[in-house]
Amino acid sequence: MEQKKTRVTIVGSVYAQPGTQFVYMGRADQCESCTIARVCHNLESGRRYEVVAIRAASHRCPVHHGGAVTVDVAEAPVEMRVSPDIARKNTTIVVKFPECDEACETFAACHPIGVVEGQKYIITDVLEGEAAPCRTGPSPVLVRVVPLPEGLPRYTP
């Protein structure tokens, strides 16, 4: 089993359950006066995280009704659709979202929440399934991606 790199952070108590996923969206205005805000905000904005362990510490929080809890999180894999010419397992990609219409039935899969455009990801799996129709190019393929871990430069064609 692969060991995931974890970070200690603080989340609202309703999210403090192993397996809960969330997308970190950045600081709220109410955080400016908080003495422990740096622990809450040690994540990368726009990325998807999964709670992997709960710690005993709980805190009052002006943002989260019911307080906040210290947890360990890891970056969560995200399923998305990509061009078939780059859909290969263990390939590093720089995400560039296609320019298409939000009314497209696969728009959300091609522009998933929790993936940051312009950042590097590794395709960990090419998933089987029906081809998705696309009006602007070849039918995109469903893959699972994880952010490229820090400190691991990879060749990207």
UniProtKB/Swiss-Prot annotation:
InterPro entries in UniProt: UPF0179
Family: Belongs to the UPF0179 family.
PANTHER family: UPF0179 PROTEIN MJ1627 (PTHR40699:SF1)
Matches recorded under HAMAP family: UPF0179
Name used for this protein in its record: UPF0179 protein Mhun_1135
Species, as recorded: Methanospirillum hungatei JF-1 (strain ATCC 27890 / DSM 864 / NBRC 100397 / JF-1)
